Amino acid sequence: MDVKIDGPLYSGKAKDVLLTDDPEIVAVRFRDDITAGDGEKKDTLEMKGYYNSVISAKIFEVLEEAGVPTQYLELREPGCILARKLEMIPIEVITRNIAAGSIVRRFPFTEGQEFVPPLIQMDYKSDEHGDPMLNDDIILALGIATRDELEEIRRITLHINSVLRDFLKSRGLILPDFKLEFGRDSSGRIRLGDEVSPDTCRLWDMETGEPLDKDIFRRGEEGVVGAYRRVARMILDDEDIERWNVEL
C-alpha cells in the first residue's frame, strides 16, 4: 500500500499512531515499551514491539478471513501496521474463558475455573478514573456507545473468541482471556482496533501450561521477549515469515 507516513496523531503506552497522506489511513508503530499495573511498572524490552506487530498482523488476518471487521490493512514492515483510522470507543472489552488474574482477586472464582459461556466484562478505558468496570446503563448515560453498538460489540466479541480459540488451539496455545478495543470507521461501522498480542491476551502453552504473555513481566520474571518470539513461531506460517521477512 503506497502511502506516506506523516506526523504523530497519538502516542499510547506501547504504540504510536501516525497520520498518513491518506486521511482514512493511519500507521501504527509498535514500541518496545512494556507496562503493567496501569502504567506503574515500566520497562523497555528490545524486539518486544517487533514481535507484537507480526503476531497482531497474523491474528488480524485470521479474523478478517473469518468475517470479523477490523481496522487492519497490512503489515508495512515488522514493527509497523497500516490501519483504517477509527474513532476509538473508550471501552476495554475483556473476554474470559478461564478464571485467571484480576477476576480471581476481585470475585470468588477459583483459579482455572472454566466459564461456559465465556464472561464478557467491559471496563472504562480511563487511567484518571482507574479503568472501572461498566454496565450498559453507565455506558449509555456517559454517551460512550449506543445500545445497538453495544449489541454489535458483544456479537463481534463472541465471534472473535470462537475463531481465536480454535486457531490458537491448532497452534498449541490456550486462550484463558483477552482484551479488545473497538472503534467506528468513517461510515460509522464498528471495527476491531488496537492490537491482539501477548500484551493483550493470556496465552498458555497447551502442553506445559506455561504462560507466554505479559504475565511474565507482571510477575517480575525474565524471558518476556523469548516468550513473545515463541508465540510468533507457533502462529506464523512459513509463508508469513517469508513475505514479511520476519526474524525468528
Swiss-Prot record:
GO terms for molecular function: ATP binding; phosphoribosylaminoimidazolesuccinocarboxamide synthase activity. Pathway: Purine metabolism; IMP biosynthesis via de novo pathway; 5-amino-1-(5-phospho-D-ribosyl)imidazole-4-carboxamide from 5-amino-1-(5-phospho-D-ribosyl)imidazole-4-carboxylate: step 1/2. GO terms for biological process: 'de novo' IMP biosynthetic process; cobalamin biosynthetic process. Keywords: ATP-binding, Ligase, Nucleotide-binding, Purine biosynthesis. Its EC number is 6.3.2.6. Gene3D superfamilies: ATP-grasp fold, B domain (3.30.470.20), Phosphorylase Kinase, domain 1 (3.30.200.20). The keyword Membrane does not apply. Disulfide bonds: none annotated. It catalyses: 5-amino-1-(5-phospho-D-ribosyl)imidazole-4-carboxylate + L-aspartate + ATP = (2S)-2-[5-amino-1-(5-phospho-beta-D-ribosyl)imidazole-4-carboxamido]succinate + ADP + phosphate + 2 H(+). It is an enzyme of class 6 (ligase). Belongs to the SAICAR synthetase family. This is Phosphoribosylaminoimidazole-succinocarboxamide synthase. It comes from Methanothermobacter thermautotrophicus (strain ATCC 29096 / DSM 1053 / JCM 10044 / NBRC 100330 / Delta H) (Methanobacterium thermoautotrophicum).
